[in-house]
């Protein structure tokens, strides 16, 4: 699972869990077919749709030196009805 970095838990992503959509950050060089293959292989689910967008990096300053963080890619994966990813299906308390 080199391409999938981690799951994202924001207000929007928690709301999308009710629609059987899961959000995760992936490496920016990964393709949609790779991500779909990894999700189907490692989690044993069927993916029916994928949406992605690239989030920009942010500027970081250390004294007079201005740097930046790398941009990253976020995928919203829609699963077929009846499938779910158990570790990501937790309620917020």
UniProtKB/Swiss-Prot annotation:
Where is this protein found?
A: Plastid, Chloroplast
* Keywords assigned by UniProt, alphabetized: Chloroplast, Plastid, Ribonucleoprotein, Ribosomal protein, RNA-binding, rRNA-binding
List, in alphabetical order, the Gene Ontology terms for molecular function in this entry. mRNA binding; rRNA binding; structural constituent of ribosome
Question: Main localization of the protein?
Answer: plastid
Task: Give Gene Ontology CC terms.
Answer: chloroplast; ribonucleoprotein complex; ribosome
UniProt keyword annotation of Nucleus present: no
Query: Does the keyword field hold Ribonucleoprotein?
Result: yes
Family matches, as InterPro entries: Nucleotide-bd_a/b_plait_sf, Ribosomal_uL23-like, Ribosomal_uL23/eL15/eS24_sf, Ribosomal_uL23_CS
Q: What processes in GO biological process is this protein linked to?
A: translation
Q: Domain of life of the organism in this record?
A: Eukaryota
Assembly information from the UniProt record: Part of the 50S ribosomal subunit.
PANTHER family named in the record: 60S RIBOSOMAL PROTEIN L23A
Report the function annotation for this chain.
Binds to 23S rRNA.
What the record says about family reads: Belongs to the universal ribosomal protein uL23 family.
- What's the protein name? Large ribosomal subunit protein uL23c
Instruction: Tell me the gene name.
Output: rpl23
């Amino acid at each position: 699972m080199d391409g999938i970095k981690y799951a994202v838990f924001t207000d929007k992503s928690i709301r999308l869990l009710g629609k059987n959509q899961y959000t995760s950050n992936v490496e920016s060089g990964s393709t949609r077919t790779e991500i779909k293959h990894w999700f189907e292989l490692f989690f044993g689910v069927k993916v029916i749709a994928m949406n992605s967008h690239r989030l920009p990096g942010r500027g970081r300053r250390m004294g007079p030196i201005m740097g930046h963080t790398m941009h990253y890619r976020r995928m919203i994966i829609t699963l077929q009805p009846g499938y779910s990813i158990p570790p990501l299906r937790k309620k917020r308390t």
